[in-house]
Amino acid sequence: MNIIKTNIEGVLIIEPRLFRDARGYFFESFSEREFEEKVTPILGHSVHFCQDNESMSSYGVMRGLHFQRPPYTQSKLVRCVKGRVLDVAVDIRKGSPTYGKHVAVELTEDNHVQFFIPKGFAHGFAVLSETAVFQYKCDNFYHPEADGGISILDDSLGIDWKIPTEHANLSEKDTKHAKLKDFDSPFDINVDLYL
């Protein structure tokens, strides 16, 4: 796998090693050993995934921007196995020099790229194809009582979702999240969420 650092520390793009021939292709979508060897030294700590999730959505669906509050914080490793999505991580750690900044990456069934989102970030995606199947690994179980979010349509974040606003399809819950300026983050850059 090839690890690409982004403009925000700890947010990583991962390109798998793909083997193609006349029959099609093969790649390891996840190897704990290789993740430990290549990603852990960059992060400075281990990440142990415990839950895999999958969603299917149609064009214009936007999910996010989600996170789980302490003590149930989550890191995520995400990929698109069918279709095309724009995936985004927003730094919501108080005191961070990149607070409110984001990294956006297009994940597709053709590029097989994966995106690592650390704890302390809000995560969301928009479906750019007719349908998309999205998979993600989490290092903590889902805890609905710790569920949180910020508005995925907050213009102050400067995210180009590549979808006209009139085509955006959000859940009722996601329409109620606060904008960043009205948001009191439960995360602080000086608190190690991996201890």
Can you say where each PLM-predicted feature lies in the sequence?
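Non-catalytic, conserved peripheral segments adjacent to functional cores
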Residues: 1-110, 131, 138-195
